[in-house]
């Protein structure tokens, strides 16, 4: 049995913007993928969120290196880094305190920090991605990731996202070694044929509040529908 849970990344909950003092929250976590040779490689992901408008955000690593983060949109509420394939390397990023310097729209500057531990997640082994015998459903199966707290699933056709399942958990007792999720083919494709990419991500949180991430891992597999 898979249990779906509510996920709030960055730990700042609320339904509306309120005029308050400038505040932001930063998160650093490890992302792991498999490269073309099948080797697990890693990089650091940074995300900073605020209900107040931010104009610039930089992060300083434990080694003293500084990197500028990109704004998600023109609203200035979210900044992040978007790693290239070359940013993934064979060893996890340096653990320790990552310091975020945030400049807000009124020119006020504040700093925040988040600590990265040594914990990582291995990418899931997707064991099968198949259509049902009658062709009306698609099933993805994978080996459970040790130590993961939850999973999420994104499905795309080319650059178009067609499905997103927020964080869900295995609610079985004991936990299953292998997991399976079925989806309606018609709901995914809306009659459009093509190659669909299933992106399965494991999530490891810093604590049981599910507010800050510690590590994620991503696996992908394609199917023609």
Give the predicted meaning of each segment.
Residues 59-88, 152-191:
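Recognizes extended acidic, P/S/T-rich segments that occur
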Residues 32-38, 130-136:
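Short, solvent-exposed loop/linker segments at the N-terminal edge
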Residues 7-37, 225:
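Bacterial Sec-dependent N-terminal signal peptides
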Residues 111-122, 208-225:
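Short beta-strand elements
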Residues 102-104, 186-217:
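Beta-strand-rich modules
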